[in-house]
């Protein structure tokens, strides 16, 4: 059952198309984060390269991807994941790369 106040995400693909997703939380922890949901949407539409990720909580504040989402992006783009841009603070326009968040990934 989705939470009433849920996170949402937008992913910009390498082709500059925007894909969106929402967080689907369940009582049994088998939910899917908004970022992965947006990436699944991108993959469903035939794309496999991420340029930027932007996620917000129910208050509209930018939030970083969780460890599972970081792992998924790294596995999806093992050669290029370090270049994916992540919005950390929209008011201050602070952007970091996934490589900054995960500098010594195991891949």
Placement of each model-derived feature along the sequence:
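Compact, glycine-rich, soluble single-domain proteins
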Residues: 22-36
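Alpha-helix C-terminal capping segments
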Residues: 41-47
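Short amphipathic alpha-helical face segments that pack within enzyme cores
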Residues: 33, 37, 68-71
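C-terminal binding/interaction regions
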Residues: 47-107
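Short beta-strand scaffold segments in enzyme catalytic cores
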Residues: 1-12, 17
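Glycine/charged-rich beta-loop-alpha catalytic/anionic-binding loops adjacent to active sites
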Residues: 14-25, 50-53
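Disulfide-bonded cysteine motifs in exported proteins
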Residues: 4, 23, 61-64
